[in-house]
C-alpha cells in the first residue's frame, strides 16, 4: 500500500578519470507499508509447558519484553484472538493465546490446543511497517567503473534485490560487481591473488587463507556430502555454509593452490586442516575460528595438541563458545583420529555470461527453494537466497540444441510463451551430456504454454550447473520466434554486493564473453539496487 510517492533524479560523479563523462545514477523512492510474514517452521517449534509452545524467529521484529509487538499470529488465514497474553495463561488455558516476547522467541498456543508441529496448519507471524522503498539505477557503457550509492541513514536497511541487465542487442558479456575492498571471489586464483601479498611467509599465507574462510562462511548443515562444497568458489558463492570438514577441505584446497602442502585430520567428531612449513605441520581450524601457538611461538600441529591439550584448555571456551575441555578430548583420543592428504579440485569459476537481453536478479528476500541432498529433516540455513536468470531463446531451425550453463546451482528451469491454438506445439527434451535426451511435457495454463524442468533436475540427485535443451518444431511451424527461459538458482547473500546503511562503493568490470574487446558502440549494462529503509516514529 503506497502512502506517498516521490521521484528524485540526481547525478553522482563516479570515481573515474577526469576525461570520462560523469556516471548517471537515477534514484527513486516512495513510502509504503511493508508486510513482513514469517512462517513458523515445525523444526523450530518446541513444546514448553502445558499448552504453550515456543517458536524461534529470525525476522528481527521488536517483542513485548522490550517494547510493544505489532505482530499478529495467523493460524492458516485466521488471526488468533489473544495477543500479549500472560505466559501462565498460555500454558494453563491456551486456546490461541500468544506472546511475541522477544525478537527471537514467540510463546503461543493453538486455537484448539493441538500440537502445532503435527496438526497440519500453517502459522504465520505478520506485521506491517512503514518503509521507504529505494531504487537506484546505474547505466554503464564502459568496461570498468566505480560508483557509490549513498544510503544516507544510520538505521538498518533491508536489501530487496540486485538486478543486472545486458542491454546490448548483440554482445554477450561477463559482469563482475563487487564492493570496493572485497577479494575477487570469481575464482580460487582470484581469491588467493586478493588475500596473499608478495613476500608473505608460509605462515602468513596459511593465516590469510584461514582468516578468509573464517570471514566468508558459517557453520550449517551442508547441501551435499562429498566434494560439491569442497571447491572454494562454490563453497563461498553458491552456499556460504557447511560443516567443519567442508571448511577444513576448502582451507586445504586453497593452501595447495598457494603452493603449500596441506592435509585434513578427522578427529571423530571434528575435522581440521594442517599446512606444512618450517619443517613441521601446523593446525588451522576455520570452523571454530581458532589455531593454537606453543610456548616456543609456532602454531601447533594436531599431534602436538594431542600431546599437550593444555594449549587448547587455556581458556574455558573457544572463539565460537565451545567447551575447550570437550574440544581437547577430540585431539587426545588419538586411537580414532585419522589424517588424509589429497588434492582437491578447485576449478569452479563464477563466469556470469549474460547474453543479449538477459536479466539477472538476486532476490535477497526469496528463500522458497534450496538445493540439498542430505540433512533434509534439519533446519534451513539462516542465510541463503534465490535468484533468477531470464533469457530469450531465439529459435530459427526445425530442431536446435543449446547448452544452458550457469555458475550457481540450478534449482528450477521453465519456459513459458503465449498459447496460439493454430500453431503446432514444439517438443522439448533435456540431457546432461548432450545424449539420451528425455522429453519434458508441455502443459497449457490458461493463455500460456509452460514447460517445467524442475522435476527432471531434482531426479538427478546432485547439484547441476548445466544441461542441454533440445527443441524440435514441426516444419510447418518453423521460422524465427522467441521463447523465454527462466532459471532459478541458489546464491550466498554474503558474497553478493549489497547497499550498506552508511553507503557503499561498488566496482564493476565488464568483459566480452568471447574474450575480445567490447565493441565501440556497445550499449552497456544496467545495474539496479533495491532496498528498504524503516520509518521510525
Model region roles, listed by residue range:
Residues 148-239:
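Secondary-structure boundary elements
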Residues 428-434:
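Conserved Ser/Thr-centered positions that define the repeating blades of beta-propeller domains
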Residues 413-416, 462-466, 473-537:
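Exposed low-complexity, polar/acidic, P/S/T/G-rich flexible segments that act as propeptides
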Residues 211, 249-317:
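Hydrophobic/aromatic-rich core segments of domains that either
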Residues 281, 294-388:
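Alpha-helical and coiled-coil interaction segments, frequently adjacent to or embedded
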Residues 21-131:
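Extracellular polysaccharide-degrading/modifying enzymes targeting complex plant/algal/animal polysaccharides
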Residues 382-412, 449-452, 524-533:
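Short beta-strands within extracellular/lumenal beta-sheet-rich domains
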Residues 10-19:
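Hydrophobic h-region of N-terminal signal peptides that target proteins for export
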